[in-house]
Design a protein with these regions (language model features):
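Carbohydrate-binding surface patches
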Residues: 79-119
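Aromatic/acidic polysaccharide-binding cleft in carbohydrate-active enzymes
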Residues: 1-92
Length: 122
């Protein structure tokens, strides 16, 4: 769930010129939910923590970014970049970089290049 949420939210952020709002349809006790409950007990799911980490992109300006030396996971039509990323800068100049490693087996070293150009508002 965390990989799907991270990858999807990074893609949405990188396409913020077209995606103005992204929501999760059902919040509790469903697939991809942010919380699970059982009677009076509740836990936050990995999806919750991805949404929590991504919150700094909200209201920020998308910055141009690229990954150098990235590899892929999957094969054929299921092949994806191993790492998805997006970068934003808020009104106070704080830059947020979020990365999603789509591999369940290995880490990936990345280099992120930022330009001074603002492309879209998130």
């Amino acid at each position: 769930d965390a990989l799907v949420a991270g990858m999807t939210l990074n893609i949405f952020n990188k396409h913020s010129d077209r995606v103005k709002m992204a929501c999760i349809a059902q919040l509790i006790n469903v697939l991809q939910s942010v919380m699970l409950t059982d009677g009076d007990k509740m836990i936050k799911t990995p999806t919750y923590y991805v949404f929590h980490m991504m919150r700094h992109h909200q209201g920020a300006a998308l910055l141009d970014s690229s990954l150098v030396g990235g590899t892929t996971v999957g094969t054929g039509k299921n092949e994806l970049p191993k790492v998805f990323e997006s970068v934003s800068e808020d009104k106070d100049g704080v830059i947020t970089v979020t990365l999603t490693n789509n591999s369940l087996e290995s880490s990936e070293d990345v280099d992120i290049m930022l330009t001074n150009e603002v492309t879209n508002t998130v």
